[in-house]
From Swiss-Prot:
GO terms of biological process kind: cytochrome complex assembly
Summary of subunit composition and partner proteins: The complex is composed of two ATP-binding proteins (CcmA) and two transmembrane proteins (CcmB).
Any one cellular-component term (Gene Ontology): plasma membrane
Pfam families: ABC_tran
GO molecular function, one term: ABC-type heme transporter activity
InterPro entries: AAA+_ATPase, ABC_transporter-like_ATP-bd, ABC_transporter-like_CS, ABC_transptr_haem_export_CcmA, P-loop_NTPase
Coiled-coil intervals: none
Membership in a protein family: Belongs to the ABC transporter superfamily. CcmA exporter (TC 3.A.1.107) family.
Keyword check for Transport: yes
The name this protein goes by in its record: Cytochrome c biogenesis ATP-binding export protein CcmA
Residues reported to bind ATP: 34-41
Keyword ATP-binding: yes
Amino acid sequence: MLEAKNLTCIRDDRCLFQQLSFCIAPGEIVQIEGPNGAGKTSLLRILAGLAEADEGQVNWRDNNIRRDRAKYHQDLLFLGHQPGIKSVLTPFENLLFYQSVFQKVDSAAIWQALAQVGLVGYEDLPVSQLSAGQQRRVALARLWLSPAPLWILDEPLTAIDKQGVSTLLALFVQHAAKGGMVLLTTHQDLGAVSHNVRKICLANTQEKSCLSACCAVN
């Protein structure tokens, strides 16, 4: 279980959210919602252990992630706004490197991942020669290779076509059905899977100078 406990985040003297607490249990898909500037990306980075909250803590399996960040990151797949891939390598080489860090290399699984994101035929081109959308798909292909139970994804559906979105949403549901956890932000309609998604809204209450959180379940 992932637990956010009394998180407060202040950026540039502005309070984005305050005393924010929630849990994500195995089998859940959770969407963080809110207007631009509400702190969605900041929250994801805090939960991923890539940034510090001004107050509060993040627990993974009842342990503060600060105690063993490396072990926590073994259980986590984080995809941010930047694809986080090496431009001098090909899509296949990028996925080969990623897979070798966490598990035994399986070339067939890499080919399958490339096929899922529509990159068959581009596997031998340097990533620097691919479009921004194609580079994004290289990063997303890691989802088919990752053994991590916890996925934290910042706008994973951006620059993805309708068929690609459907494929990703089906993968999220499959991952959750196996006991995994998916935490994401997106501006896109989750359509048919929205009934499986719990939403946490970072909403401006207007009565306070700080953005607080409210939770709603579809």
